[in-house]
Amino acid sequence: MENSFKAALKAGRPQIGLWLGLSSSYSAELLAGAGFDWLLSDGEHAPNNVQTVLTQLQAIAPYPSQPVVRPSWNDPVQIKQLLDVGTQTLLVPMVQNADEAREAVRATRYPPAGIRGVGSALARASRWNRIPDYLQKANDQMCVLVQIETREAMKNLPQILDVEGVDGVFIGPADLSADMGYAGNPQHPEVQAAIEQAIVQIRESGKAPGILIANEQLAKRYLELGALFVAVGVDTTLLARAAEALAARFGAQATAVKPGVY
């Protein structure tokens, strides 16, 4: 039951991850054996639901990689369902201020600390009440990562960092660059300056900074600045680009694709 991902962040051990967008338990298991510290099952931009997340959690469970799940929104009902199927670490998107961060934390805690509904007899998380004292232990194993993706969220970062129960803050470079007027260009100097400043600020607060970036040089730079959970690729991108490159090498008509953010 111990959340080893949360423990690693608390100990200051950098965790390298991979984004999962294929919404497949089969590919999730394949990638769980690849050597990443964590795998992000994306419910915001990939066609996932509670059932597909459940199958991915089951597929990843035998491997050292730790699962992180991103719901589609900061919604306590959706969060409750994801926790009941076994999610312990959540990446909550588009958190704009401290109040929204508190709502995310409360959604992961049983009363009186929060508002998570008690349904452990039906929950994989408690192994259907086979885990002794699950209701008493669960709150401490929840890891809440909130995602800041706009100028407003950046402005409110000091207050977000003061919220008890927030374990880490993830910077969303794609949405942030769009909000700053540089859509599709997260490497713009102004965007990079904002990202670097935020990473340092988050780490100095005692929280864990995180980010997704497929550029290896930038990923290493963020780690040097103190980022603790860094996703360095996306499964859909890896598959698409590798397939195109293979087709091109054998003379097939590969589709010309403009390089994306990831």
Swiss-Prot record:
Cofactors named for this entry: a divalent metal cation
Active site location: H45 (proton acceptor)
Reactions performed catalytically: 4-hydroxy-2-oxoheptanedioate = succinate semialdehyde + pyruvate
Transmembrane spans: none
InterPro entries: Aldolase/citrate-lyase_domain, HKHD_aldolase_ent, HpaI, HpcH-HpaI_aldolase, Pyrv/PenolPyrv_kinase-like_dom, Pyrv_kinase-like_dom_sf
UniProt pathway: Aromatic compound metabolism; 4-hydroxyphenylacetate degradation; pyruvate and succinate semialdehyde from 4-hydroxyphenylacetate: step 7/7
GO cellular component, one term: cytoplasm
Alphabetical keyword list: Aromatic hydrocarbons catabolism, Lyase, Metal-binding
Pfam families: HpcH_HpaI
Domain of life assignment: Bacteria
Cofactor note: Binds 1 divalent metal cation per subunit.
Chain residues that bind substrate: Q147, A174, D175
GO BP, one annotated term: phenylacetate catabolic process
GO MF assignments: 4-hydroxy-2-ketopimelate aldolase activity; metal ion binding
Enzyme Commission number(s) of this protein: 4.1.2.52
Entry annotated with the keyword Lyase: yes
Family matches, as SUPFAM superfamilies: Phosphoenolpyruvate/pyruvate domain
Chain positions recorded as a divalent metal cation binding sites: E149, D175
Site feature Transition state stabilizer, where: R70
Subunit organization: Homohexamer; trimer of dimers.
Family that this chain belongs to: Belongs to the HpcH/HpaI aldolase family.
Function: Catalyzes the reversible retro-aldol cleavage of 4-hydroxy-2-ketoheptane-1,7-dioate (HKHD) to pyruvate and succinic semialdehyde.
Classification via PANTHER family: 2-KETO-3-DEOXY-L-RHAMNONATE ALDOLASE, PHOSPHOENOLPYRUVATE CARBOXYLASE FAMILY PROTEIN
Protein name from the UniProt record: 4-hydroxy-2-oxo-heptane-1,7-dioate aldolase
Source organism of this protein record: Shigella boydii serotype 4 (strain Sb227)
Gene from which the chain derives: hpcH
